């Protein structure tokens, strides 16, 4: 079953969600010989936000749901190249230290992916995302963001490797009269799995993000840069030929000026 990639963050808990940390097993194992088809994916993340790197945390916990529709299509002039376009809608709920909570729609995303298979068991791809500030006021980043990432998958027998490296270019945010320059993000993610028998395909993960410093454009105050590295463990389930699921636990092991990752991820993918 082909995997599909996505990334999503939101303002109140952005620091606790590493970009592309939602990638699971076979995420970038994409076909090049196919008739057009569709995939629905649901990514669900619960994070304990009570701890932070290098300072107090402002939250208790957060729940993020990312729902994506992806359409695979072909270009006749490029028979050995695969393409898909994708749309993401979702919601977030964040509980703060004072027991107040905010919830609503995250900023929608639209994207496109193109890929080739240099070898029968090796995929390389490029993905572009546009983030538009149409989410609810207390959830939105209030900025137009763009990201681009290199993606790869390699399989050898029961062994599967997925990885990516990318950059997210974050626009200036405008909210409640405050204009803020936000630092860009660099990120990388690795996933390594081994299939013993059907539905027993454990995997380990390594996720990393580094955010550049920003600035309050009104006061001139600097917003500190931040970074985090997290590791995870989970299992991939091939439930049917059209339905798959991944579940894993991800925990931050090093970081700075950031909410500590302490999260459970659950992913479903359905082909139709």
Q: What do these predicted ranges mean?
A:
Residues 139-143, 178-187:
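Active-site glycine- and acidic-residue-rich loops that bind
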Residues 14-132, 146-170, 185-187, 191, ...:
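Transmembrane beta-barrel domains of Gram-negative outer membranes and organellar outer membranes
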Residues 131-139, 168-179:
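Surface-exposed cleft-lining segments at the edges of enzyme active sites
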Residues 254-257:
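Short proline/glycine-enriched turn/loop segments at secondary-structure junctions
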Residues 54, 138, 175, 216, ...:
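Outer-membrane beta-barrel and related beta-rich outer-membrane complex signature
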Residues 2-12:
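C-terminal segment of classical bacterial N-terminal signal peptides
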């Amino acid at each position: 079953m082909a995997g599909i990639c996505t990334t999503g963050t939101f303002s109140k808990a952005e620091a606790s969600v590493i970009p592309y940390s939602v990638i699971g097993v076979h995420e970038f194992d994409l076909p090049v010989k196919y008739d057009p088809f569709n995939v629905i994916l649901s990514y669900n993340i619960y994070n304990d936000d009570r701890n932070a790197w290098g300072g107090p945390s402002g939250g208790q916990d957060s729940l993020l749901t990312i729902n994506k529709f992806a359409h695979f299509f072909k270009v006749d002039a490029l028979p050995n190249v695969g393409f898909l376009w994708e749309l993401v809608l979702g919601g977030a709920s964040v509980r703060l230290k004072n027991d107040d909570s905010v919830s609503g729609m995250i900023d929608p995303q639209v994207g496109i992916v193109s890929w080739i298979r240099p070898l029968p068991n090796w995929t390389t791809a490029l993905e572009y995302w546009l983030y538009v500030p149409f989410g609810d006021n207390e959830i939105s980043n209030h900025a137009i963001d763009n990201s681009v990432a290199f993606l790869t998958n390699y399989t050898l027998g029961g062994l599967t490797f997925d990885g990516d490296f990318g950059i997210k270019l974050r626009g200036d945010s405008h909210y409640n009269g405050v204009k803020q320059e936000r630092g860009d993000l660099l990120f990388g993610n690795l996933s390594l799995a081994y299939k013993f028998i059907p539905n027993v395909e454990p995997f380990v993960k390594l996720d990393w993000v580094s955010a550049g410093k920003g600035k309050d454009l009104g006061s001139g105050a600097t917003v500190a840069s931040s970074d985090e590295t997290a590791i995870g463990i989970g299992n991939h389930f091939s439930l049917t030929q059209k339905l798959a699921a991944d579940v894993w636990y991800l925990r931050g092991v090093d970081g700075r000026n950031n909410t500590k990752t302490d999260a459970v991820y659950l992913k479903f993918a359905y082909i139709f």
